[in-house]
Structure formats: structure tokens, C-alpha cells
């Protein structure tokens, strides 16, 4: 009962806040003479034709966003881990490269970085728009992920390395079997925040005419004059993505914690 009451209270608060938001939006729309057309929104998600269901513009954009985010996330984690290890290394050159990369990326806007990659570096190295978007997102989010992982590495006691070495483990297996599980457990919540940021930042690549969820939403609005319905739908889809990711992270954190405690 002690656990159920806070959950019910939180659900009640969420329902009340949602009801208040709906009332405010409806009142504002009526004051402007706006006519809601929610019945048209499903046609831009799925449509039925020739006996089959087909993905409409919003669903097509969502699939592009998911593809873009998934590939960018892979490179983000690889780049973040590599940079974190470089900043922890004994090599002066390695530390300088890692520090310089993080400093440059974190102190310049993502939009400017996208323009530089798209208009300057992309044509030089022959990248298409999608690859440029993946590179821009991975470079940007990788710098922040590197700091998260570096903080996690700093929190692992030096004795863990020494104990693994005394058991005869190589450097690779020391990191893979001893350090990495602890690093994941320590950094999973902040890493989830970085993943959520990656999903949200993926909307910025719409400036490159990539047909992601945001671009498709903008195109639909220009064709239908339904700004409220479409943008609220787009926002709801992004919210569903980020909340699902947060829930998955909480489940993984619980499983990893239980597994670590059992050992």
C-alpha cells in the first residue's frame, strides 16, 4: 500500500495536469476561431489502400528518425568511450586530442556544426545528407557522453585494476570483465539522458532536408494548415520515444543492479 499510494497520487496529478492543458488549448483555439481537425491526423500516420495498410508521412518520418538515432547512438557510444579512455591515458597526445575534441564540440552550437559538416566537410569527403547527419549527431553527443563515461571511470577504485592484474587478466579482459560492468551500472542513468538528448537533437537535422519526423510534420503543416494538431502529434511521438527509453533504462538498471549484487 505504501508503494501504491504514491503511484496513484502521481497518476492523478498527471491526469489533472493533462486535463488542464487540454482545457487551456481548447479555450485558446476557440478564442482564435480555430477549428480542430483531429479526425484527419490518423491519415498522416497510416492509410489503407489496395487492400493493404501503408505508412503515411508521420510514420515514415518516425522510421527515419529511429534509423538516424540508432546509428548515431552506436557511433556516439564508441566515440564517447574512446575519448574517455584517451583522456584517462598516459599519452600526452591522447589526452590533448580528447580534451581538444570535447572543448571544441561543447563550446559550439550543434546547428553550426551541422552547417560546417554539411556545406564544408561533407562535400570534400563525399558524404551524403544522411551520413552527414549521423556524423554531426555522433560528434556532438559523443563529447558529452565522453564526460559521463570519464566520470564513471574515475569513480572505479584503482584496486579493481590491481586485483584483475594480480589474477593474470590482460588489459582487454580487465576492462571487459571487471571495469565495463561497473561502468555501465554507474553511468546508465546519465547515459540515458544523453540518449534522450540524441533523440531530441535529431530533429535539428531537418535543416538538411532529411525527411525525419520533424521535416514531415513541417511539410504536412504547410499543406494542410493544421499546425496545432500536427505539431502536438509530433511532440507526442517524441515524448513516447523518450519515455519508452527512460522506462527501458530503469528496467536495465534494476536488472544490472540485481545481477551485480548477486555476484
Where are the language model's segments positioned?
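Transmembrane alpha-helices and adjacent helix-loop boundaries
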Residues: 1-263
Amino acid at each position: 500500500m505504501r508503494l501504491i499510494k504514491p503511484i496513484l497520487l502521481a497518476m492523478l496529478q498527471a491526469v489533472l495536469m493533462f486535463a488542464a492543458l487540454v482545457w487551456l488549448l481548447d479555450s485558446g483555439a476557440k478564442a482564435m476561431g480555430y477549428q480542430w481537425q483531429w479526425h484527419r491526423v490518423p491519415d498522416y500516420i497510416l492509410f489503407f489502400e489496395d487492400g493493404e495498410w501503408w505508412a503515411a508521412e508521420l510514420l515514415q518520418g518516425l522510421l527515419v528518425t529511429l534509423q538516424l538515432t540508432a546509428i548515431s547512438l552506436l557511433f556516439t557510444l564508441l566515440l564517447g568511450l574512446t575519448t574517455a579512455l584517451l583522456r584517462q591515458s598516459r599519452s600526452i597526445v591522447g589526452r590533448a586530442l580528447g580534451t581538444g575534441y570535447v572543448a571544441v564540440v561543447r563550446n559550439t552550437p550543434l546547428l553550426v556544426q551541422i552547417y560546417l559538416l554539411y556545406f564544408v566537410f561533407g562535400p570534400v569527403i563525399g558524404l551524403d545528407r544522411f551520413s552527414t547527419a549521423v556524423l554531426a549527431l555522433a560528434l556532438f553527443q559523443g563529447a558529452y557522453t565522453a564526460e559521463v563515461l570519464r566520470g564513471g571511470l574515475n569513480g572505479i577504485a584503482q584496486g579493481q585494476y590491481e586485483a584483475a592484474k594480480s589474477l593474470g587478466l590482460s588489459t582487454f579482459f580487465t576492462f571487459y570483465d571487471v571495469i565495463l560492468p561497473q561502468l555501465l551500472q554507474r553511468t546508465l542513468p546519465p547515459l540515458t539522458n544523453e540518449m534522450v538528448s540524441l533523440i531530441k537533437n535529431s530533429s535539428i537535422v531537418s535543416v538538411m532536408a532529411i525527411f525525419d519526423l520533424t521535416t514531415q510534420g513541417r511539410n504536412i503543416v504547410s499543406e494542410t494548415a493544421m499546425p496545432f494538431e500536427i505539431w502536438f502529434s509530433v511532440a507526442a511521438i517524441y515524448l513516447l520515444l523518450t519515455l519508452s527509453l527512460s522506462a527501458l533504462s530503469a528496467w536495465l538498471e534494476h536488472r544490472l543492479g540485481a545481477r551485480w549484487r548477486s555476484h
